[in-house]
Amino acid sequence: MRLRKKWWARPEMEASSLVITNPKEYKGKWMEEFKNNNSIHLELGCGRGGFMQEKALKNPNINYVAVDLKDEILIYVLRKLKEKEIENVRIVPLNIAFISEVFEKDEIEKIYINFCNPWPKLRHNKRRLTHNKFLDEYKKFLKGQGEIWFKTDDIGLFEDSQEYFKESGFSIEYITYDLHKSDFKDNIMTEYETKFTSMGMKTMFLIAKLK
């Protein structure tokens, strides 16, 4: 669905200290930005920010970076954070293809990828955020033994991703084909997940650990 351009979004975002519009200048300096030594978790494709908001509220001693491309989406993330007075999140407008230019080695402890585009056509597979091409980029800044938490409702993407993780030096620590009927207790639902679970959608989930 094409988003209607919100010309007012960028000025509002640039006026907030929660939004980092020049993230490449922060490489290796994220702890300085957060003004503490807490671990940093990264969400790739944060959407409207419901997941990130809940994570940050439940874990005030963890710092979070929320990345997405469109100002038209990220402005809603910013407003959620301001409404709840959340200070342990930074919003980054960025094409994820450039993510390794933003973080230094060992700077990120955990990555969340929730319901990314499945890119089902073979010629588009390399655009998947779990493809080996992207995993190799994440390994440049993910700590040893760091984790990627991955959720999807697309069976093809889920099964292909298991192979991508294994080929890229990750071990699968947890996996379920029906998250909401599993024994996993630490799930926070995204807006998409909430809507479509009520319509019968099954969510698949895995935790991959960097060896």
Curated annotation (Swiss-Prot):
Chain positions covered by the region annotation Interaction with RNA: 123-128
Binding-site residues, S-adenosyl-L-methionine: E43, D68, N95, N117
Keyword DNA repair: no
GO cellular component: tRNA methyltransferase complex
Enzyme class, spelled out: transferase
GO molecular function, one term: tRNA (guanine(46)-N7)-methyltransferase activity
Residues bound to substrate: K121, D153, T190, E191, Y192, E193
Keywords noted in UniProt: Methyltransferase, S-adenosyl-L-methionine, Transferase, tRNA processing
Reactions catalysed, as given in the entry: guanosine(46) in tRNA + S-adenosyl-L-methionine = N(7)-methylguanosine(46) in tRNA + S-adenosyl-L-homocysteine
PROSITE patterns the UniProt entry points to: SAM_MT_TRMB
Signal sequence segment: none
Pathway listed: tRNA modification; N(7)-methylguanine-tRNA biosynthesis
EC id: 2.1.1.33
Protein task: Catalyzes the formation of N(7)-methylguanine at position 46 (m7G46) in tRNA.
Family the UniProt entry places it in: Belongs to the class I-like SAM-binding methyltransferase superfamily. TrmB family.
Cited PANTHER family: 3-DEOXY-D-MANNO-OCTULOSONIC-ACID TRANSFERASE/TRNA GUANINE-N 7 - -METHYLTRANSFERASE, PENTACOTRIPEPTIDE-REPEAT REGION OF PRORP DOMAIN-CONTAINING PROTEIN
Protein name: tRNA (guanine-N(7)-)-methyltransferase
